[in-house]
Design a protein with these regions (language model features):
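A generic short alpha-helical patch detector that favors 3-5-residue windows
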Residues: 27-28, 162
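Short loop/helix-cap segments at secondary-structure boundaries that form the rim of catalytic
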Residues: 20-24, 41, 63-64
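A short beta-strand-loop structural module common to alpha/beta enzyme folds
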Residues: 30-38
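Residue-level detector of anion-binding/catalytic polar loops
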Residues: 28-30, 200
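N-terminal beta1-alpha1 ligand-phosphate binding loop
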Residues: 2-27
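Cofactor-binding loop segments of dinucleotide-utilizing enzymes, especially the Rossmann-like FAD-
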Residues: 14, 34, 121
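Anionic-ligand binding patches
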Residues: 3-9, 43-202
């Protein structure tokens, strides 16, 4: 049952990519910086970390806006080497670091973990999950990497590439249940949660 006057909807993020994704659902919403502590806990694995951070971001904003539904999200890229050892890849921040990250991704599989939590009234969680997307990079030479970074400058993206842009040309394959997850917000399962909360979609 859809609500005639649904409560406010807030995206607990300052990411323009997540904002653009949520705009696809054509719902009225606002954005707030979550201000949550993102320090990893000792021994915390990547999947547990992104789930906790998504929940913490949503809860931090919900504490300030108790009547609103709040969406929190977090993403991490994890590189798998030939022995199966995991290493995390953050947002490169600089051109040199971006080039180094893509060099380390060449010919390898990168797992993107995208967590979502939808909460209301100071942490009363309605819905939370972690989407897993596997990206297999083709073998990349130095010139290809440098051209890509110069053209797209994906310095604020986990893993140092944008699948929605030229980054798709670096891929050999992408295995995902939700193509929007890799960009930063899995809309298929998020829209299901929002429908459960009473938002009219479509």
């Amino acid at each position: 049952m859809f609500l005639k006057s649904p409560p406010p909807l807030i995206l607990a993020s300052t990411s323009r990519y997540r904002k653009e994704l949520l705009e696809r659902l054509r719902l009225a919403f606002s954005c707030m910086a979550p201000g949550a502590d993102e320090t990893p806990q000792l021994g915390e694995d990547p999947k547990t970390l992104v789930a906790r951070l998504a929940r913490a971001k949503a809860a931090a904003v919900a504490a300030q806006q108790p009547n609103a539904w709040v969406i929190g999200s977090d993403q991490m890229a994890v590189r798998l080497d030939e022995a199966g050892t995991e290493s995390t890849l953050g947002k490169p921040g600089t051109e040199m670091r971006c080039i180094e990250q893509l060099q380390s991704c060449s010919g390898r599989t990168i797992v993107f973990l995208t967590a979502v939590a939808v909460v209301r009234q100071e942490g009363n969680t309605l819905f939370e999950f972690v989407d897993t997307t596997r990206v297999r990079f083709r073998v990349l030479d130095q010139a290809t990497i440098e051209r890509y970074v110069a053209k797209e400058r994906p310095l604020d993206c986990a893993g140092g590439f944008k699948s929605e842009g030229l980054g798709i040309t670096l891929c050999e394959s992408i295995d995902s249940a939700d193509p929007s997850a890799l960009i930063g917000l899995p809309l298929i399962r998020l829209s299901a949660a929002l429908r459960s909360a009473g938002f009219e979609l479509p």
